[in-house]
Amino acid sequence: MSIRLAVLGDPLRYTRSPELHRAGCAALGLACESEALRTPVDALPATLERLAREGYAGCNLTMPLKEPALDCVARPSPAARRARSVNTITFSMETGVTLGDTTDGAGFLDLLAQEGRDPASVRVVLLGAGGSARSLALAIAERGGEPVRVVSRHEPEPGDAWGGALGERWSAWGSLAADRAVAQAQVLVNCTPLGNADLPQPRGGIAPDALVVDLPYGEAPSAWVTAARAAGLDAVDGLALLVHQARHSFRCWFDRDVPLEPLLAAVRRSP
């Protein structure tokens, strides 16, 4: 009998998660069926109920579902509650309880290690303040790293405990303070869906030794990643984080470790 997995989001045009699900399960000796299900926010509760009813083992979530998913799971992990974000859901067949977790932060720490950056000492600046950004920031804090700086279009809401705690570490998009933060970043992460024209440019605006990470991904490296590489910077797109967070998703679902190489190979094979 095949394991059934899915990825939910809207849009899902370039998702690679089904390939990663199948490759990870194959590495564990499990047959797997995985599908991409375009899911608007208002359809999320009913979709999760259907997947649980039909015997799915779990699913991954992408934008814009990570934050609303917190209210759709019976038992969110402590990390998911702190980040107010869920990207991995497990449907427990034994208890019938729907479990929610966020693996973005743990995957980000693995990505930094792969790129030779010490999470405990690197200066991270996040562009955006949504669920993914919170997951990354909290993971850095739990590793004992320097508190991250955040640049976003909107000031954190008064009731947002994480955003409110940023204080002077938050800067408004386009401000002089934001420009200074970006210029001092050792790791600069775009956690928004914005395109290249709206993002800080590599030549002159970003430190030459910085690592640039663009969380969105598509069929080819983004224009921002391409420009950063052309300027001589180390740069990776969201596929790198996707692979690392997928390994942690498998731990949530099966309590087993998946080797990194089969997942990387699956991404390389994908169109």
PLM feature spans:
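Rossmann-like adenosine-cofactor binding region
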Residues: L166-V236
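Conserved S-adenosyl-L-methionine
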Residues: E142-P147, A231-L233
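Glycine-rich adenosine-cofactor-binding loop
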Residues: G9, T102-G105, L112-A113, S121-G145, ...
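Short helix-loop-beta connector
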Residues: R117-R123, A207-P208
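Phosphate/diphosphate ligand-binding glycine-rich loop within oxidoreductases
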Residues: S2-E115, E219, A231
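NAD(P)-binding Rossmann-fold cofactor-contacting core
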Residues: G145-L166
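Adenosine-phosphate binding glycine-rich loop
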Residues: L215-P271
